[in-house]
Protein backbone atom coordinates (compact mmCIF):
# COMPACT_ATOMS: atom_id res chain seq x y z
CA UNK A 1 0.00 0.00 0.00
CA UNK A 2 1.48 3.37 -0.92
CA UNK A 3 2.04 5.93 1.83
CA UNK A 4 -0.72 8.24 0.63
CA UNK A 5 -3.26 5.41 0.81
CA UNK A 6 -2.10 3.91 4.10
CA UNK A 7 -4.68 3.21 6.77
CA UNK A 8 -4.38 6.09 9.19
CA UNK A 9 -4.77 6.79 12.77
CA UNK A 10 -6.94 6.46 15.69
CA UNK A 11 -6.76 7.52 19.29
CA UNK A 12 -6.49 5.06 22.17
CA UNK A 13 -6.18 6.40 25.72
CA UNK A 14 -5.80 4.55 29.00
CA UNK A 15 -5.67 6.11 32.43
CA UNK A 16 -5.87 5.22 36.08
CA UNK A 17 -7.29 7.54 38.73
CA UNK A 18 -8.35 6.56 42.24
CA UNK A 19 -8.01 2.84 41.41
CA UNK A 20 -10.37 3.23 38.42
CA UNK A 21 -8.85 2.20 35.08
CA UNK A 22 -10.48 3.31 31.82
CA UNK A 23 -9.49 2.62 28.22
CA UNK A 24 -11.10 4.77 25.52
CA UNK A 25 -10.98 4.62 21.73
CA UNK A 26 -12.47 6.62 18.90
CA UNK A 27 -14.35 4.85 16.13
CA UNK A 28 -12.86 6.20 12.90
CA UNK A 29 -11.14 4.10 10.25
CA UNK A 30 -9.53 6.08 7.42
CA UNK A 31 -7.93 5.11 4.13
CA UNK A 32 -5.97 7.96 2.62
CA UNK A 33 -8.19 11.02 2.96
CA UNK A 34 -11.39 8.97 3.08
CA UNK A 35 -13.31 7.91 6.18
CA UNK A 36 -14.24 4.26 5.70
CA UNK A 37 -16.07 3.75 8.96
CA UNK A 38 -16.96 5.92 11.93
CA UNK A 39 -18.13 3.22 14.36
CA UNK A 40 -15.20 0.77 14.49
CA UNK A 41 -14.62 -1.06 17.76
CA UNK A 42 -10.92 -0.93 18.65
CA UNK A 43 -11.17 -2.25 22.21
CA UNK A 44 -11.40 -5.85 23.32
CA UNK A 45 -11.92 -7.37 26.74
CA UNK A 46 -10.05 -10.48 27.82
CA UNK A 47 -10.34 -12.71 30.90
CA UNK A 48 -13.88 -11.63 31.84
CA UNK A 49 -13.13 -7.87 31.61
CA UNK A 50 -10.10 -8.19 33.87
CA UNK A 51 -7.83 -7.25 30.96
CA UNK A 52 -8.68 -4.72 28.26
CA UNK A 53 -6.70 -4.03 25.11
CA UNK A 54 -6.91 -1.33 22.45
CA UNK A 55 -5.01 -1.07 19.20
CA UNK A 56 -3.94 1.56 16.72
CA UNK A 57 -2.77 0.77 13.21
CA UNK A 58 -3.94 -1.78 10.69
CA UNK A 59 -7.24 -3.35 11.73
CA UNK A 60 -6.35 -6.84 10.57
CA UNK A 61 -2.97 -6.61 12.29
CA UNK A 62 -4.54 -5.35 15.50
CA UNK A 63 -7.04 -8.21 15.54
CA UNK A 64 -4.25 -10.73 14.89
CA UNK A 65 -2.36 -9.32 17.87
CA UNK A 66 -5.45 -9.54 20.09
CA UNK A 67 -5.71 -13.25 19.26
CA UNK A 68 -2.02 -13.81 20.05
CA UNK A 69 -2.35 -11.86 23.31
CA UNK A 70 -5.37 -13.92 24.37
CA UNK A 71 -3.38 -17.12 23.88
CA UNK A 72 -0.47 -15.75 25.93
CA UNK A 73 -2.81 -14.64 28.71
CA UNK A 74 -4.31 -18.12 28.94
CA UNK A 75 -0.85 -19.73 28.85
CA UNK A 76 0.41 -17.50 31.66
CA UNK A 77 -2.70 -17.73 33.88
CA UNK A 78 -3.82 -14.11 33.36
CA UNK A 79 -0.41 -12.64 34.25
CA UNK A 80 -0.56 -9.57 32.01
CA UNK A 81 3.04 -8.43 32.38
CA UNK A 82 4.50 -11.83 31.53
CA UNK A 83 2.02 -12.31 28.67
CA UNK A 84 2.89 -8.90 27.21
CA UNK A 85 6.62 -9.57 27.38
CA UNK A 86 6.19 -12.97 25.72
CA UNK A 87 3.99 -11.46 22.98
CA UNK A 88 6.53 -8.69 22.40
CA UNK A 89 9.33 -11.27 22.07
CA UNK A 90 7.30 -13.23 19.52
CA UNK A 91 6.29 -10.04 17.72
CA UNK A 92 9.93 -9.02 17.40
CA UNK A 93 11.35 -12.39 16.37
CA UNK A 94 8.62 -14.04 14.27
CA UNK A 95 8.87 -13.32 10.53
CA UNK A 96 5.10 -13.06 10.09
CA UNK A 97 4.39 -11.06 13.24
CA UNK A 98 7.28 -8.67 12.57
CA UNK A 99 5.37 -7.33 9.56
CA UNK A 100 2.29 -6.42 11.57
CA UNK A 101 1.66 -2.68 11.68
CA UNK A 102 -0.11 -1.96 14.94
CA UNK A 103 0.49 -0.84 18.51
CA UNK A 104 -1.45 -1.90 21.57
CA UNK A 105 -2.32 -0.62 25.00
CA UNK A 106 -3.27 -3.34 27.47
CA UNK A 107 -4.33 -2.89 31.07
CA UNK A 108 -5.40 -4.82 34.12
CA UNK A 109 -5.80 -3.75 37.77
CA UNK A 110 -2.01 -3.60 38.23
CA UNK A 111 -0.50 -2.49 34.93
CA UNK A 112 -1.00 -0.19 31.98
CA UNK A 113 1.32 -1.28 29.15
CA UNK A 114 2.15 -0.07 25.65
CA UNK A 115 3.29 -2.81 23.25
CA UNK A 116 5.07 -2.03 19.99
CA UNK A 117 6.28 -4.06 17.03
CA UNK A 118 9.85 -3.20 18.00
CA UNK A 119 9.52 -5.51 20.98
CA UNK A 120 8.92 -2.70 23.46
CA UNK A 121 6.77 -3.20 26.54
CA UNK A 122 6.49 0.20 28.22
CA UNK A 123 4.74 0.96 31.49
CA UNK A 124 4.13 4.71 31.26
CA UNK A 125 4.62 7.21 34.02
CA UNK A 126 1.78 9.17 35.58
CA UNK A 127 -0.81 6.39 35.04
CA UNK A 128 -1.65 7.64 31.52
CA UNK A 129 -0.88 6.08 28.13
CA UNK A 130 -2.02 6.94 24.62
CA UNK A 131 -1.26 5.70 21.11
CA UNK A 132 -2.35 6.51 17.58
CA UNK A 133 -2.41 9.66 15.53
CA UNK A 134 -4.39 11.53 18.18
CA UNK A 135 -2.50 9.94 21.04
CA UNK A 136 -0.33 12.91 21.95
CA UNK A 137 -3.35 15.22 22.05
CA UNK A 138 -5.27 12.82 24.31
CA UNK A 139 -2.21 12.19 26.49
CA UNK A 140 -1.56 15.90 26.98
CA UNK A 141 -5.18 16.64 27.80
CA UNK A 142 -5.46 13.72 30.23
CA UNK A 143 -2.27 14.64 32.08
CA UNK A 144 -3.42 18.25 32.42
CA UNK A 145 -6.89 17.27 33.59
CA UNK A 146 -5.50 14.76 36.09
CA UNK A 147 -3.21 17.44 37.51
CA UNK A 148 -5.71 20.28 37.81
CA UNK A 149 -9.24 18.83 37.90
CA UNK A 150 -9.34 16.73 41.05
CA UNK A 151 -13.13 16.53 41.04
CA UNK A 152 -13.32 14.63 37.71
CA UNK A 153 -13.61 10.84 37.57
CA UNK A 154 -11.35 8.71 35.38
CA UNK A 155 -14.23 8.28 32.93
CA UNK A 156 -14.85 12.04 32.71
CA UNK A 157 -11.15 12.74 32.15
CA UNK A 158 -10.98 10.07 29.44
CA UNK A 159 -14.04 11.44 27.63
CA UNK A 160 -12.86 15.07 27.76
CA UNK A 161 -9.37 14.08 26.61
CA UNK A 162 -10.66 11.96 23.74
CA UNK A 163 -12.93 14.77 22.59
CA UNK A 164 -9.99 17.20 22.59
CA UNK A 165 -7.99 14.70 20.51
CA UNK A 166 -10.90 14.28 18.09
CA UNK A 167 -11.15 18.06 17.72
CA UNK A 168 -7.47 18.24 16.71
CA UNK A 169 -6.73 14.98 14.86
CA UNK A 170 -8.37 14.53 11.46
CA UNK A 171 -7.95 10.74 11.72
CA UNK A 172 -9.98 10.48 14.96
CA UNK A 173 -13.65 11.14 15.67
CA UNK A 174 -16.05 11.81 18.53
CA UNK A 175 -17.58 8.31 18.52
CA UNK A 176 -15.87 7.36 21.78
CA UNK A 177 -16.11 3.88 23.26
CA UNK A 178 -14.88 3.31 26.81
CA UNK A 179 -14.26 0.16 28.83
CA UNK A 180 -13.51 -0.12 32.54
CA UNK A 181 -11.13 -2.71 33.97
CA UNK A 182 -12.95 -4.67 36.69
UniProtKB/Swiss-Prot annotation:
Reactions catalysed, as given in the entry: ATP-dependent cleavage of peptide bonds with broad specificity
PROSITE patterns: PROTEASOME_BETA_2
GO MF: metal ion binding; threonine-type endopeptidase activity
Coiled coil: none
Alphabetized Pfam families for the sequence: Proteasome
Classification via InterPro entries: ATP-dep_Prtase_HsIV_su, Ntn_hydrolases_N, Proteasome_sua/b, Proteasome_suB-type
Cell compartment(s), UniProt: Cytoplasm
EC code(s) of this entry: 3.4.25.2
Superkingdom of source: Bacteria
Gene: hslV
Catalytic residues identified in the record: 10
Assigned keywords, A-Z: Allosteric enzyme, Cytoplasm, Hydrolase, Metal-binding, Protease, Sodium, Threonine protease
Oligomer and partners: A double ring-shaped homohexamer of HslV is capped on each side by a ring-shaped HslU homohexamer. The assembly of the HslU/HslV complex is dependent on binding of ATP.
GO-annotated cellular components: HslUV protease complex; proteasome core complex
Description of activity control: Allosterically activated by HslU binding.
Name under which the protein is recorded: ATP-dependent protease subunit HslV
